[in-house]
Amino acid sequence: MSTNPFDDDNGAFFVLVNDEDQHSLWPVFADIPAGWRVVHGEASRAACLDYVEKNWTDLRPKSLRDAMAED
């Protein structure tokens, strides 16, 4: 049975962000998907999760936050 590389506590990761300011952990061996950019790492999974918890405090997409701010 294979393991999920996204759950590897010993793996190296990046934190990615898209245009909606949504964050994702991404294993360093995998290609960065179109529309995403690296904002943290290469680092441990724990360090990347810590970065996400500290920096992605509003889970609403950017477009929704912007629309609500206009009201």
Curated annotation (Swiss-Prot):
- Can you quote a single GO CC term? cytosol
Q: Can you name this protein?
A: Protein MbtH
Q: Name one Pfam family in it.
A: MbtH
Q: Name one GO biological process term.
A: siderophore biosynthetic process
Relate the protein's function as given in its record.
Answer: Could be involved in mycobactin synthesis.
**Stated family:** To M.tuberculosis MbtH.
